[in-house]
């Protein structure tokens, strides 16, 4: 009896994990990020704050009224990320 209860719990756990993995992979692969427009002042502040505190997006967003940590991170990744660097290069070649 104990063994079957344990096996049942493991099965439930595996199902939950596989659902979580599936939703994460779908989310990542299906997202098409739109460019985040930042003013020059915001860009400067983000760069300076990043040098001071690293990727603590909540802290950086707290210094820029009306911006969420997600927007700040998305902006940073799109401007400085390797994946987006290739897209920028291809875009400007056209």
Swiss-Prot record:
Signal peptide: none annotated. GO terms for cellular component: nucleus. GO terms for molecular function: DNA binding; DNA-binding transcription factor activity. Expressed in trichomes and in young developing leaves, as well as in root hair and stele cells (pericycle and vascular tissues). Expressed in epidermal root hairless cells (atrichoblasts) and moves to root hair cells (trichoblasts) by a cell-to-cell movement through plasmodesmata (at protein level). Induction: Transcriptional repression correlates with reduced histone acetylation on H3 and H4 mediated by HDA18 in root epidermis N cells (non-hair developing cells). Induced by WER. Negative autoregulation by interfering with the binding of WER to its WER-binding sites (WBS) promoter region, especially in H cells. Down-regulated by GEM. Down-regulated by TMM. Interacts with GL3 and BHLH2. Interacts with SIEL. Keywords: Developmental protein, DNA-binding, Nucleus, Repressor, Transcription, Transcription regulation. InterPro entries: Homeodomain-like_sf, Myb_dom, Myb_TF_plants, SANT/Myb. Residues 1-25 are annotated as: Disordered. Residues 1-10 are annotated as: S1, required for cell-to-cell movements. The keyword NAD does not apply. CDD domains: SANT. It comes from the Eukaryota. SMART domains: SANT (SM00717). Residues 76-79 are annotated as: S2, required for cell-to-cell movements and nuclear localization. This is Transcription factor CPC. Its main location: nucleus. Residues 1-11 have a biased composition (Basic and acidic residues). Transcription factor. Determines the fate of epidermal cell differentiation. Represses trichome development by lateral inhibition. Together with GL3 or BHLH2, promotes the formation of hair developing cells (H position) in root epidermis, probably by inhibiting non-hair cell formation. Represses the expression of GL2 and WER in H cells. Positively regulates stomatal formation in the hypocotyl. Changing residue 76 to A: Loss of cell-to-cell movement and of nuclear localization. Residues 30-80 form the Myb-like domain. One of its GO terms (biological process) is positive regulation of trichoblast fate specification. It is found in: Nucleus.
């Amino acid at each position: 009896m104990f063994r079957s209860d344990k096996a049942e719990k493991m099965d439930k756990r595996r199902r939950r994990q596989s659902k979580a993995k599936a939703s994460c992979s779908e989310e990542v692969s299906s997202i098409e990020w739109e460019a985040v427009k930042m003013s020059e002042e915001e860009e400067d502040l983000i760069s300076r704050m990043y040098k001071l505190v690293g990727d603590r997006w909540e802290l950086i967003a707290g210094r820029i009224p009306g911006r969420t940590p997600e927007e700040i991170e998305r902006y940073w990744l799109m401007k400085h990320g390797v994946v987006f660097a290739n897209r920028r290069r291809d875009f400007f070649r056209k």
